[in-house]
Amino acid sequence: MSMKLEISFAPSALIEAGLVLSLKEAEATLPAGAATVDPSGIFAKAAATAKFKAKAMSVLDILAPTGSQADRLIVIGAGKAADLVDHDWLRLGGVAAANLKGSEAVTVFLDADGLTITAEGVRDFAIGMLLRAYSFDDYKTKKKDDDDKAPSAVQITLVTAVADAAERLFAAEGRAVVDGVLLARNLVNLPANVLGPVEFADRAKALEALGVEVEILTETEMASLGMGALLGVAQGSVRPPRLAVMQWKGGAPEGQPIAFIGKGVVFDTGGISIKPAGGMEDMKGDMGGAAAVIGLMHTLAARKAKVNAIGILGLVENMPDGNAQRPGDIVTSMSGQTIEVINTDAEGRLVLCDALWYCNDRFKPAFMINLATLTGAILVALANLHAGLFSNDDTLAENLLKAGLSTNERLWRMPLGKDYDKLIDSKFADMKNTGGRYGGSITAAQFLKRFVGDTPWAHLDIAGTAMASPKDEINQSWASGFGVRLLDQLVRDAYEA
């Protein structure tokens, strides 16, 4: 189960029984708080014995020194100050959280010699702790043996000279980011029998408590709008589709909104073009794009972002029954363009094309960004270390790449072009939904591009990063919540008033 961490901030602290964590810069002699924590100077001996060099994210765990009230002392290496980047404070917080087991009271000294720590860095350290503390075991009926010994909550005190400013920042922004990421992770981790399109739409509706305006379009309403592409995907499932439309109005009333659209295929069998059985259980995560969008909208509303933002979720289930869409079917999208369905497992783009057109037609946004676990081809190209970025606008793309570097939710820009676009021309309709074996992630993006007009647009293919990505300092869960921090940073950096 997730550890419950209750974090406070203080400029100083008296050490009582419990765990003490201290940061240490690689070239400094002593860790943070050494005069308080280590009056007998045992750290230097322990570090020499263990050959501890305080490399970034390394840990030295020692018994508390004589004269200290603490039970344990853990020193976390920060590496060389010159090598630290913004997202390293998140990682350091994650390392700290990974070493809390069994502790009820924890004091963390952050102001190490050689480090320049800001309120933003402390905020990010706290965020990293909370993200690392997350786990998903809601459906386990038997606890691990050590769960019974775990405290109901761990009291964390972050000790730093910038405590007051950090506390204000965390309250205003940090908690909102954590809650948005964890919302996205929870949704991706949930089994599909629990989270169908209707249930997902209900989760969107719950954002009304934060001041988000939410509309849920039913199957009938989508049919009246001509969303034949989205509805074609849904027709094989007994679970009806939904389109969730969320509006956060934090900017000027006349301000042009920005828009985020998420693919929400709550389970993807592939339809008639059915997937192999091996690994199909992971297709409960094929709504990772929609999860990121709802997490982002939660974050923007919770921190009262000064921006007008639209979030749209296309929510369907792709199943193979007697009413399912067939290869060779031709559907008419909301745009009026016709699509030959070559492969029913290329369904995400069919959902997104109607959602994109609806968004552009109704809201006239300044830009649209869609997120989707869209293609296996992006995994072949980029593994699960970068998400694919496709865009028709260089400024938007550069802003996204910058936010990716800042948050370590990394993107790699992929090509688009007329020669790729020709690959999705159809003999029988305006286009087909797959372009063949080669360049699959690119032809999928070219398909989406046909539905955005001249509006600045970016497509993030997060098939490799939304789930089953490598575990790291801030995430040990199958679901990552990828996209929430990235897009929140994008809004902060470039689009918030």
Curated annotation (Swiss-Prot):
Cofactor note: Binds 2 manganese ions per subunit.
Keyword annotations of the record: Aminopeptidase, Cytoplasm, Hydrolase, Manganese, Metal-binding, Protease
GO annotation, biological process: proteolysis
Binding-site positions, Mn(2+) 1: D268, D345, E347
Cofactors, names only: Mn(2+)
GO terms under cellular component: cytoplasm
EC number annotated for this UniProt entry: 3.4.11.1, 3.4.11.10
First-listed, main subcellular location of the protein, grouped into a coarse class: cytoplasm
Cited InterPro entries: Leucine_aapep/pepB, Macro_dom-like, Peptidase_M17_C, Peptidase_M17_leu_NH2_pept, Peptidase_M17_N
Active site: K275, R349
Family: Belongs to the peptidase M17 family.
PANTHER family cross-referenced by the UniProt entry: CYTOSOL AMINOPEPTIDASE, LEUCINE AMINOPEPTIDASE-RELATED
HAMAP family documented for this protein: Cytosol_peptidase_M17
Record function comment: Presumably involved in the processing and regular turnover of intracellular proteins. Catalyzes the removal of unsubstituted N-terminal amino acids from various peptides.
Protein name: Probable cytosol aminopeptidase
